[in-house]
Amino acid sequence: MEAALNIASPSLPGVMPGQLEFTTSAAAKVSELIVEEGNPNLKLRLYVTGGGCSGFSYGFAFDDQTAEDDTLIVTEGVALVVDAMSLQYVLGARVDFEDGLEGSRFVIHNPNAQSTCGCGSSFSV
């Protein structure tokens, strides 16, 4: 069962649960990585920056801090954090973890992306 819960979004108070999905497979992988890091306070931060071959790039980092205007999505007890600027580009997206022939990686299925590059790490809106 996939779950998404918006705990707090001061920057976009109208954001409803499910408008940004953090899948159980992504949460399970993040949980494994948190155990490896040995810091139970870590959260996966998703951010969008300018650059990449299509205009914007996705990035992920572990963070044990949250800002007042961050949006926090919790699935299976694991938190995904998105800053206010990045949130506008990923609303409606699904953050997933895929393990396949091309390797293991976090993937963002973003309906807002008008085009993406071949590797899937950059997009345009």
Curated annotation (Swiss-Prot):
Q: Any idea which GO molecular function terms this record carries?
A: 2 iron, 2 sulfur cluster binding; 4 iron, 4 sulfur cluster binding; iron ion binding
Give the taxonomic lineage as stored in the record: Bacteria, Pseudomonadati, Pseudomonadota, Betaproteobacteria, Burkholderiales
Q: Name one GO biological process term.
A: iron-sulfur cluster assembly
What quaternary arrangement does the UniProt entry report?
A: Homodimer.
Disulfide bridge partners, by residue number: none
Its keywords, alphabetically, are: Iron, Iron-sulfur, Metal-binding
Organism equals: Polaromonas naphthalenivorans (strain CJ2)
Q: Which residues hold iron-sulfur cluster?
A: C53, C117, C119
Q: What is this protein called?
A: Putative iron-sulfur cluster insertion protein ErpA 2
Matching entries from InterPro entries are given as: FeS_biogenesis (IPR000361), FeS_cluster_insertion (IPR016092), FeS_cluster_insertion_CS (IPR017870), FeS_cluster_insertion_RrpA (IPR023063), HesB-like_dom_sf (IPR035903)
Q: How is the cofactor bound?
A: Binds 1 iron-sulfur cluster per subunit.
Gene3D superfamilies from the UniProt entry: HesB-like domain
Physiological role: Required for insertion of 4Fe-4S clusters.
Return any one Pfam family short name: Fe-S_biosyn
Q: Which Gene Ontology cellular component terms are annotated?
A: cytosol
